[in-house]
C-alpha cells in the first residue's frame, strides 16, 4: 500500500470488482471521452473479476501494475492508476494511465496518486522512464502530469483510436532522477 495525505493506493483485488464496476458505470460517459471502446463484459461484475484476476497475473510477471485509489477517510474506491506496457532490459520504461471519479476532479487527488505511483516505479521497480499520452483537449490530465513532474515531449499524431476516431496525443514523460547522476 502506498499512502498519501488524503488517499492511499494499492493493487486492485478481486474483492474490489463490485466497487470498481460502480465507479466505471457511474462515470461511463465521462471516462469514455478519453478511453478506448470497452468489451461488452466490461460493465459486469464477472467482467471486472476476470479483468482484476488478469491484472494480478500480470503484476506477478512484472508486466503491469493496476492500483485502486482509495480515500483515506472511508476506504472508498474513487479511481485507478496503472503502469502498463512495461519494458525491461535497456529501456526500463512504462506507460501510466488513470481514471478518477468526476466528483473528485480538481482536488489534487490524481496528482497525489500519480506521484505515489511514480515514486514506487522509480524506487521499487527501478524504472528509468514513465510516459503518458494525453488527448490535447484533456487539459486537466495534462495539468496532473505536469504537477507530478512530467514534461511535454511532442505530439504523437493519430496515435490511439478513441470512440472510433484516431486521436492525436500529447506525449509527456518523466525520468528517474536517480539515473541522472
UniProtKB/Swiss-Prot annotation:
InterPro entries: Acyl_CoA_acyltransferase, GNAT_dom, N-acetyltransferase. It comes from the Bacteria. The keyword Acyltransferase applies. GO terms for molecular function: protein-N-terminal-alanine acetyltransferase activity. Residues 7-172 form the N-acetyltransferase domain. Keywords: Acyltransferase, Transferase. Its EC number is 2.3.1.-. The keyword tRNA-binding does not apply. Disruption phenotype: Non-essential, it can be disrupted. PROSITE patterns: GNAT. It is an enzyme of class 2 (transferase). It catalyses: an N-terminal L-alpha-aminoacyl-[protein] + acetyl-CoA = N-terminal N(alpha)-acetyl-L-alpha-aminoacyl-[protein] + CoA + H(+). One of its GO terms (cellular component) is cytoplasm. Probable N-terminal protein acetyltransferase. Belongs to the acetyltransferase family. RimJ subfamily. This is Probable N-acetyltransferase YjcK.
